[in-house]
Curated annotation (Swiss-Prot):
<dbReference type="GO" id="GO:0005737">
    <property type="term" value="C:cytoplasm"/>
</dbReference>
<dbReference type="GO" id="GO:0005524">
    <property type="term" value="F:ATP binding"/>
</dbReference>
<comment type="pathway">
    <text>Pyrimidine metabolism; UMP biosynthesis via salvage pathway; UMP from uridine: step 1/1.</text>
</comment>
<protein>
    <recommendedName>
        <fullName>Uridine kinase</fullName>
        <ecNumber>2.7.1.48</ecNumber>
    </recommendedName>
</protein>
<comment type="pathway">
    <text>Pyrimidine metabolism; CTP biosynthesis via salvage pathway; CTP from cytidine: step 1/3.</text>
</comment>
<dbReference type="GO" id="GO:0044211">
    <property type="term" value="P:CTP salvage"/>
</dbReference>
<dbReference type="GO" id="GO:0004849">
    <property type="term" value="F:uridine kinase activity"/>
</dbReference>
<keyword id="KW-0963">Cytoplasm</keyword>
<dbReference type="GO" id="GO:0043771">
    <property type="term" value="F:cytidine kinase activity"/>
</dbReference>
<comment type="similarity">
    <text>Belongs to the uridine kinase family.</text>
</comment>
<dbReference type="InterPro" id="IPR026008">
    <property type="entry name" value="Uridine_kinase"/>
</dbReference>
<keyword id="KW-0067">ATP-binding</keyword>
<dbReference type="Pfam" id="PF00485">
    <property type="entry name" value="PRK"/>
</dbReference>
<dbReference type="GO" id="GO:0044206">
    <property type="term" value="P:UMP salvage"/>
</dbReference>
<feature type="binding site">
    <location>
        <begin position="13"/>
        <end position="20"/>
    </location>
    <ligand>
        <name>ATP</name>
    </ligand>
</feature>
<dbReference type="InterPro" id="IPR006083">
    <property type="entry name" value="PRK/URK"/>
</dbReference>
<dbReference type="InterPro" id="IPR027417">
    <property type="entry name" value="P-loop_NTPase"/>
</dbReference>
Length: 212
């Protein structure tokens, strides 16, 4: 596969801003148009650094909302490999254990790769790998309420720990890194992942890039 045959779309924004929802919607609709074997989704979360050498007490102190917590270099390497026609083994990250597992998920080359993650647009090298980028501009208080519900229900967190993390790292890192990265987005999406007009615009852009 030649690099021009692979379109990479990056969807960034605060945690619980609607990134996964719009990525899922675009994935499902493009699968109907292009086939399920032609579209891939990569979550930035999979590239949290391995912390197997640290104790659990040390792992929970990691600032997961800082760019240094993520191995963007590996993500860039994987994107370049996919563009060159090579399959890659994506890490599997455990939210309960705060480190990578021994498992890998193999992703084969696709016509469209959809990236989604909070810090995608903070990395210049990663931005260069994207053909188009999106920032989900959802109010932070709404994101917090969604995150609180999600992390308690799906990730085994206590309400107190989620609130403490939000105060100590999530909100400060959003203001320091994530919100400023909005300037690099090609499309800014208000009102979350259910914004139908924004979804249609992004799909049209992807189809235009594929037609080149």
């Amino acid at each position: 596969m030649n690099s021009k045959d692979c379109v990479v779309i990056g969807i960034a924004g605060a945690s619980a801003s609607g990134k996964s929802l719009i990525a899922k919607t675009i994935y499902e609709e493009l699968c109907r148009d292009l086939g399920t074997d032609q579209i891939g989704v990569i979550a930035e979360d999979a590239y949290y650094r391995d912390q197997g050498h640290l104790s659990m007490d040390q792992r929970v102190l990691t600032n997961y909302d800082h760019p240094k917590a993520l191995d963007h270099e590996l993500l860039c390497t994987h994107l370049r490999a996919l563009k060159q026609g090579h399959a890659v083994d994506i890490p599997v990250y455990s939210y309960n254990d705060h480190t990578r597992t021994d498992e890998k998920v193999t992703l084969t080359p696709k016509k469209v790769i959809i990236l989604e993650g909070i810090l995608l647009l903070t990395d210049p090298a990663l931005r260069k790998e994207m053909d188009a980028s999106v920032f989900m501009d959802t109010p932070l208080d709404i994101c917090f309420m969604r995150r609180l519900s999600r992390d308690v229900a799906e990730r085994g967190r206590t309400m107190e720990s989620v609130m403490q993390q939000y105060t100590e790292t999530v909100r400060p890192m959003f203001l320091q890194f994530i919100e400023p990265s909005k300037q690099y987005a090609d499309i800014i999406v208000p009102r979350g992942g259910k914004n139908r007009i924004a979804t249609d615009i992004l799909k049209a852009r992807i189809q235009h890039l594929l037609a080149k």
